[in-house]
A protein has these predicted regions:
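Small-polar-interrupted transmembrane alpha-helices in polytopic inner-membrane proteins
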Residues: 68-82, 133-145
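Membrane-embedded catalytic cores of phosphoryl/pyrophosphoryl-handling enzymes
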Residues: 94-179
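N-terminal transmembrane-helix/juxtamembrane module of multi-pass inner/ER membrane proteins
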Residues: 1-47, 62, 78-104
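Interfacial segments of alpha-helical transmembrane regions
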Residues: 49-77
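Residue-level signature of the transmembrane alpha-helical core
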Residues: 35, 50-51, 68, 136-140, ...
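Multi-pass membrane proteins that catalyze or facilitate reactions on polyprenyl-/lipid-phosphate substrates
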Residues: 1-11, 22, 53-56, 64-65, ...
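Membrane-helix interface segments
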Residues: 27-29, 59-63, 91, 128-134, ...
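Membrane-water interface at transmembrane helix exits
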Residues: 53, 78-86, 125, 172-176
Length: 179
């Protein structure tokens, strides 16, 4: 029986997940990615929005409201996509993969953490480009943590990144920056 290109891709992706997940056997790696993932649950973004308001007043409030509106759209979008796709998480599909932290929901596609991190970062950087040295590495860490911790496939993270770019771009077009 022939293997389809999609099956080959799924096999490669599963191997990549197993390899990435193996790094969490090291306590420091596991702790680092667990903390990044936990901050990506929302804590980091809520603190950032509050700090923007405190440090930049009305302009910070405007940026924070824009981020919150984009975050709400991201939440509704990814919840709907997860219910529609119903893709099992890597640890549920392959017993060699361990979930090193508890997932927030049942399904894998797309990565909600990544979708939020990328969309929040794009909107925040539109207002405050000088935050890039903080936000870009953190966002990359959130995306990577989802695969390393056994919660997402790389394609979940890549798809979420693409969706987030489209969503953030649409929000910036719909709610343009003040002149």
């Amino acid at each position: 029986m022939r293997t389809t290109p999609l099956e080959l891709l799924a096999g490669r992706e599963a191997r990549l997940c197993r390899r990435a997940n193996h790094y969490c056997r090291r306590r420091r790696v596991r702790r680092l990615f667990s903390v990044i993932s936990r901050l990506g649950d929302g804590v980091f973004w809520y603190v950032l929005m509050g700090a923007l308001v405190l440090l930049d007043g009305f302009d910070g409030l405007r940026a924070s409201v824009h981020m919150a509106a984009t975050g709400l759209a991201a939440l509704l979008l990814y919840k709907g996509l997860k219910r529609w796709a119903r893709r099992p998480r890597p640890y549920a599909a392959d017993l060699r993969i361990r979930a090193w932290v508890a997932p927030l929901d049942e399904f894998s596609f797309p990565s909600g953490h990544t979708l939020h991190a990328v969309s929040f970062t794009i909107v925040a950087l539109a207002y405050y480009p000088w935050l890039a040295p903080l936000l870009v590495p953190f966002t990359f860490g959130v995306a990577l943590s989802r695969v390393v911790l056994g919660l997402h496939y790389p394609s979940d993270v890549l798809a979420a990144t693409g969706i987030a770019i489209l969503l953030a771009s649409a929000s910036l077009a719909w709610l343009p920056l003040p002149v």
